[in-house]
Amino acid sequence: MRFFNLVMAVTSMATLWAVAGAPVWAQQPISAQSAAQKLMVVPGSKYPGRMHVLPATMETTQWGWFDNGELPRLIIDSGDTVAIESMSHSHGQLYPGRTIEELKKLRTDWPARGPMTLTGPIFVNGAEPGDTLQIKIQKIVPRPWGANFNVPGLFGQFPSRFPDGQVKYFYLDNEKKTTEFAPGIEIPLRPFPGTLGVARKDPGRYNAVPPGPFAGNLDNRDLVEGTTLHVPVFVRGALVWQGDSHAAQGNGEVNLTGLETAFQEITLTMTVDKATKLEWPRIETPTEWITMGFDEDLTKALANAKSETAKFIAEQRKVSPEQAMPMVSKTSDCRVTQVVDIKKGVHCMTSKDVAKSLAEPRPTAETPQYLV
């Protein structure tokens, strides 16, 4: 029995499905006191709201796709916290010992879907289209192994560099928060969810690889413990998914994968924000705001990120985006997020202590501050 009898929970959740296959959330409110909800509430939490647990099983996960008509696997109230378990790629078929030939077959036999396994969706009571959902990452505990691989000649930014493919497995020392890449070379662990987001507006089943306004497969290495994802809501209940667990990754994710793993636990607090209206997701760290842009063309992704950053600065300083645009190059650090998710990503990091004035003050004396 894993946390609770999941079969009973999913059976109870099935009563939420309305006549003719239409989701009940399109017709009437859903109570957080449902039978399924009570099964998933656990006592003894130090985090905000009720505490829930959602394990990763074949009943609570999907392999490589989003669908906003998917039955919720958990219903929570705004402000509640969920400890979520995740699976490795391809419904748990990535694990130490798998050969690169086996991993390649998982991609070539299932080309229409992404490789990531997604736990969810989670329905958040009170979330409506036009709202913003705040998802704070409270805690991440990876499993004790990770993998980095390239499918032979097929994927990644530089497939020709790996014509035969490669896979390497690692032991993750969660106490030291490191892994040994080679004798004498240690890589610090910095776990984050590669995929975290809400249901897209469009009905139907979509490949989960490309990110978008709904967030999703951001692959942003700065979405770590203590940060909050702010994402616009497109369907009632938001419908939150999490997966594609990473133990570490560099900006760009240039060889297709980061240090791929699965999470024993990722603990998220979800809060509905009725006041903030967003068109694209943002990440809040203790010291910075991160704005994002996506496009198949990296230059256009940068332009989108720059526009979002100017919009953010304009909101903060109460000026027009045109006035804020020159500040982007002065106050923001723009980085390539990833180049492997069909739609490439660029993100710009802006200090919470953004410039106090858009106008540079007139100097009172000639100093090295102005001339060298």
Feature names for model-found ranges:
Residues S34-Q37, V41-W110:
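N-terminal, Lys/Arg-enriched amphipathic/low-complexity engagement segments
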Residues A18-A20, V24-A26, A32:
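Boundary at the C-terminal end of the N-terminal hydrophobic targeting segment
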Residues H89-I100, I140-N150, G237-A247, T337-V340:
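Short, Lys/Arg- and Gly-enriched loop/turn segments at beta-strand edges
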Residues V7-A20:
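Bacterial N-terminal signal peptides
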Residues T57-D67, P111-T119, Y206-F214:
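Short, structured beta-strand/loop micro-motifs enriched in basic residues and often containing a Trp
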Residues P191-N217, R221-T299, A310:
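Conserved mixed alpha/beta catalytic, RNA-binding, or beta-rich assembly cores of soluble enzyme
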Residues M116, K139-L223:
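Intrinsically disordered, low-complexity linker/loop segments enriched in Gly/Pro
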